């Protein structure tokens, strides 16, 4: 009993000391990193050329400290349901591997679960997208993908999907945003594709069909060291696919807003702009019902216009996912409490969204998509 009590007291006092150390300014320094860091450069990597190679969707990190990587899929299905899954690897405090799976049925009923895996149960390939977590997998070659979620890992709900790309892969320049040696990277491997396959619920299969999207992200430094937040969108209007984002750099990195806009159909790419002159953005409709009152302003509406006559309006409506990132990352409660005292509460929010596209000289058209907010403060 004495040894149990001693162990308990050691743990208690360790967390108490940690809590005191992390409160207020100490907590802020720990989370946001050092002040003396390289600023974002207006000249970004541009060496790979316009053609995306299969290896680019393979493993891009080596497992070094502070590296992270994920492969993402979302699908808007013909029956009105929405499906999202992502395979993550993170190397911040130890090595963590997990899958997030979110399914919203046509009636608005939500299912969401995170499942963690041991390092011995996961594998990757640097030659192509070949990601295996236990009996779950995400595999493909830029043209065709298979995505499997094992119902045994997700409370009886799973998928066995095929994704066939209808557009060439897209990345802005090399897809890498750097500040010194620190970087964040993004590849839209399948800007738009046709989804088919099965939804499995308690052993019963239902055929699914619709449109899908797959991208791949990786980096070598905590996201909050680079960005305050970002917004991202992918959607469809008739035959056109739209991918849009604005990355809001931290003041320490220069405080730049970096817009990205891609509009394409099977015939050509109509817009491909990355942090360029001639692309303007506006955010509006402040969110008041999802975050605490101390949170910095975040908005559910984004407008983008180009100097050559393209206008995009995006509005996030029903919430698909709204998660505190500390809770999702299984951060210990005393640290979460300390972060909260320092008014640091990062959230990830995803909306089922509407959009409109106006092209000069044409009638405006409307469509749908997925709108994401990554709040890192």
Residue ranges and their predicted role:
Residues 2-13:
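Bacterial N-terminal signal peptides that target proteins for export
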Residues 12-23:
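Bacterial N-terminal signal peptides
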Residues 28-377:
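Structured soluble/peripheral alpha/beta segments that form catalytic or ligand/cofactor-binding pockets
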């Amino acid at each position: 009993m004495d040894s149990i009590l001693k162990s308990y007291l050691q743990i208690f006092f360790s967390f108490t000391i940690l809590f005191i150390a992390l409160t207020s300014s100490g907590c802020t320094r720990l989370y946001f990193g050092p002040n003396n860091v390289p600023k974002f450069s207006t000249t970004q990597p541009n060496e790979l050329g316009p053609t995306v190679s299969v290896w680019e969707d393979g493993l891009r990190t080596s497992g070094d400290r502070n590296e992270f990587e994920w492969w993402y899929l979302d699908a808007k299905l013909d029956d009105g349901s929405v499906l999202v899954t992502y395979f993550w690897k993170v190397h911040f405090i130890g090595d963590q591997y997990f899958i997030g799976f979110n399914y919203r049925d046509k009636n608005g009923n939500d299912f969401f679960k995170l499942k963690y895996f041991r390092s011995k149960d996961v594998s990757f390939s640097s030659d192509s997208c070949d990601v295996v977590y236990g009996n779950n997998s995400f595999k493909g070659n830029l043209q065709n993908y298979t995505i499997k979620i094992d119902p045994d890992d997700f409370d009886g709900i799973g998928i066995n999907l095929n994704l066939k790309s209808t557009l060439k892969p897209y990345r802005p320049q090399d897809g890498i945003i750097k500040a010194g040696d620190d970087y964040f990277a993004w590849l839209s491997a399948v800007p738009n594709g046709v989804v088919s396959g099965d939804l499995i619920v308690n052993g019963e299969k239902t055929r699914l069909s619709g449109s899908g999207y797959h991208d791949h992200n990786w980096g070598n430094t905590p996201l909050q060291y680079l960005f305050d937040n970002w917004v991202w969108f992918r959607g469809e209007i008739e035959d056109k696919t739209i991918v849009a984002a604005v990355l809001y750099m931290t003041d320490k990195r220069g405080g730049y807003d970096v817009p990205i806009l891609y509009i394409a159909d099977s015939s050509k790419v109509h817009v491909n702009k990355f942090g360029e002159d001639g692309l303007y953005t506006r955010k509006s409709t402040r969110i008041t019902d999802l975050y605490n009152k101390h949170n910095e302003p975040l908005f559910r509406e984004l407008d983008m216009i180009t100097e050559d006559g393209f206008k995009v309006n995006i509005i996030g409506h029903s919430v698909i996912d709204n998660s505190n990132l500390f809770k999702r990352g299984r951060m210990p409660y005393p640290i979460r409490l300390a972060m909260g005292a320092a008014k640091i509460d990062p959230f990830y929010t995803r909306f089922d969204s509407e959009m409109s596209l106006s092209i000069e000289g044409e009638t405006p058209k409307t469509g749908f998509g997925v709108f994401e907010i990554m709040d890192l403060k």
